[in-house]
Amino acid sequence: MKQSMVFSPTLREVPADAEIKSHQLLLRAGFMRQNASGIYSFLPFGLKVLHKVERIVREEMERAGAVELLMPAMQAAELWQESGRWYSYGSELMRMKDRNAREFALGATHEEVITDLVRDEVKSYKKLPLTLYQIQTKFRDEQRPRFGLLRGREFLMKDAYSFHATQESLDEVYDRLYKAYSNIFARCGLNFRAVIADSGAMGGKDTHEFMVLSDVGEDTIAYSDTSDYAANIEMAPVVATYTKSDEAEKELEKVATPDQKAIEEVSAFLNIEADKCIKSMVFKVDEKLVVVLVRGDHEVNDVKVKNVYGASVVELASHEEVKELLNCEVGSLGPIGVNGDIEIIADHAVASIVNGCSGANEEGFHYVNVNPERDFKVSQYTDLRFIQEGDQSPDGNGTILFARGIEVGHVFKLGTRYSEAMNATFLDENGKTQPLIMGCYGIGVSRTVAAIAEQFNDENGLVWPKAVAPFHVHVIPVNMKSDAQREMGENIYNSLQEQGYEVLLDDRAERAGVKFADADLFGLPVRVTVGKKADEGIVEVKVRATGESEEIKVEELQTYIANILK
C-alpha cells in the first residue's frame, strides 16, 4: 500500500483526554478517532490490526470445532424478561423502544438470543454437542467510558456458546476452548494469565478470565510466587490460620472516640493495633440486610458475601438503611447490641480477636476489650475477606503477589442457568426431557487491540508484534525527488510484496524527520530506509522492537528480512 493514498492522520501532541498509552498512541498514529464518549471509528491502519486479531480468533475457534454465525444486535425485551436479566442486568443494558412502543435491548451479550435459536432447532441429544460463535458489535451504557478501547460503550466482541447433553461433554469443550483462548493470546504476542474468576451477571460457575498484565488494568490478579496459581482477587480464597492468644479476657468498656471514624483513626487514638479492631459493615444481600465483620486490617470481599448466600445482588447498604437498622452513623457501627433478628456473619480472623475494639453503634463512642461470642454472637464464620500480598497461596505453594490485569477473555460453564429459565430442552437417549447444558466464551476483540498496544510501545510510538501489525515492512525513500531513491524504493516495495509480505511504501513528498516520526508512531516490525547510498545499492534496515539497524546490500534484503520476520 502506498502511504500517499492512505487515510492515516497523525497527531504530534497527546490528546488531552487520553489517559493511557494505548489510547494516546492509537489516536496519535491515526489508527482510530473518537465519535462520542466511548465510541470510536477504526481508521484504515487500525482496521487492519483489528482484522488480524479477528483472523487469529477465527482460526483458533474453528480449530476447536466452533462454527460461526451472526445474530442481531437488536434484541427483543421478551427474551431478556424470560431469562430474568431484563430486571437484574442493570443500567448498563442499552434499552430502546420502536415506534410501536415495543421494548428492545442493544446486545451487551447474546445468551438469550442463542438459547432461543437453539431451543427451536435442537430437540435431540443426537445433535449435541454444538458450539456456535460470532464476532459482532456489542453495546454497554458505561457510566464512565475511559481508557479508549478498554472501556467503551460500543465494542467488537467474539462470543461463543456451547450446548451439551452431559456435564462431561461441557467439561471437554470448555477445556478445548480454554486452550484455544491461550493460543489466541499467545499468537497475539501478549503476556497474559488465565485466572480463576467470578461469573458476575452471566451466571453459572467454573469460570476463568484471561488477563493481559498491565499497570493500567482495572482488575487485580493474585498469583503465587512459586506455582501456576492465579485468580482474580475477588475469587482467591484465604487459607490462613489464626491462633487465638492466651491473653485473659478483660471487662468490656465503652470509651469516647470523638471524631474518630476510620479504623486507622480509631486504632491510633486508642493505641490499639488495627488487627485487634473489628470492622463492621452492613450489606444488602438481595433484599436482606446483613452485618459483616472482618478484622480491621482486612477488607470485606463482597463477592464472597454474595457466594455465602447464593445471592443475585450484593451491595453496601445505604446511609439511610444503616441509620434505620442500627440507629447510628456508619463510622460507629459495631456488632454489640445488634437486634437478634439481624444476622451477623464474620471472617475467620475475627474469631481469634481477644480484647479488641469495635464501634458502639453510638456516635463518638467505641467499645474496647471486645471478645467475640462473649459480647456478641456470630451466625457463621467463613472466608469473607480479600486475600492480601504475603498470604499463603491457596494451592499451598508459595506466597501471594499482586499484579494488575486487563481482562480480554472470559470462559464460563453456565450449566442450565439459561436453558431452565427459557425452557430450552432436548430428549436424552432414554427419551426423557432434559435442560440443555451450556457454556459461554467471550473475547473482547477491539479490547485485545488496545491491550496489545498497551504492552507493545515505547516513547516514540507503537511496536506491533508481527502477527497483528498492519504491515510487515515500512519502506521509506528519504527523498522522493531523487530518481535513484524513488525507483529503488518502488522496486523493493514490489519485490517484497511478491514474496508475500505486506508492505507500506512512504511515497509522500515529506521531510525525512516527518517520515521517520510517523514510522515510529505506526510501529511496523521492519523499516527499510532508502537514502543517499541508493546509488551504491545500499539500504538501512531497522528493527522497530529493538532499535537495531544495519546497512546492507539491496540484493541481500529479502534474506535479511526473512530472518527478522521468521
From Swiss-Prot:
Q: What is its main location?
A: cytoplasm
What Gene Ontology terms describe what this protein does at the molecular function level? aminoacyl-tRNA deacylase activity; ATP binding; catalytic activity, acting on a protein; proline-tRNA ligase activity; transferase activity
Name the domain of life: Bacteria
List where in the cell it is found.
Cytoplasm
Its UniProt entry gives the catalysed reaction(s) as:
tRNA(Pro) + L-proline + ATP = L-prolyl-tRNA(Pro) + AMP + diphosphate
UniProt keyword ATP-binding, yes or no = yes
Under the heading PROSITE patterns, the entry gives: AA_TRNA_LIGASE_II
Q: GO CC: one term?
A: cytosol
Gene3D superfamilies given in the database record:
Anticodon-binding domain (3.40.50.800), Bira Bifunctional Protein, Domain 2 (3.30.930.10)
According to the UniProt entry, what is the EC number of this protein?
6.1.1.15
Q: Which SUPFAM superfamilies match?
A: Class II aaRS ABD-related, Class II aaRS and biotin synthetases, YbaK/ProRS associated domain
Q: What does the comment on domains in this protein's record state?
A: Consists of three domains: the N-terminal catalytic domain, the editing domain and the C-terminal anticodon-binding domain.
Its biological function?
Answer: Catalyzes the attachment of proline to tRNA(Pro) in a two-step reaction: proline is first activated by ATP to form Pro-AMP and then transferred to the acceptor end of tRNA(Pro). As ProRS can inadvertently accommodate and process non-cognate amino acids such as alanine and cysteine, to avoid such errors it has two additional distinct editing activities against alanine. One activity is designated as 'pretransfer' editing and involves the tRNA(Pro)-independent hydrolysis of activated Ala-AMP.
Q: Which family would the database say this protein is a member of?
A: Belongs to the class-II aminoacyl-tRNA synthetase family. ProS type 1 subfamily.
What's this protein's name?
Proline--tRNA ligase 1
Q: Which organism is it from?
A: Bacillus cereus (strain ZK / E33L)
Q: Which gene encodes it?
A: proS1
